[in-house]
């Protein structure tokens, strides 16, 4: 099932080509006072995605910046690589939901995936 959530006045990026009506409430994620979104990660939760980003296939335990940059020196110390693919697949752990999140935003997107807090 695909659900669409719209915040503010988004730019038409045409990255979603099928008409999907906006849903009312955002499942799984919690809106934080600072404008960010969070998800409670179980100890065995795994987070996949983000395209060309440093580190291994499980993105948990690090912070990332989705920003298309033409930087030739790639390494573990970089927060962002060339391609920004704002799609996450979150396996919540034993007995919890598996779901995906696609962020359709043309600017920088900052991710803290269990880096500051291992459980968020």
How would you label these PLM feature ranges?
Residues 1-120:
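Catalytic and substrate-binding clefts that recognize carbohydrates or anionic sugar/phosphate headgroups
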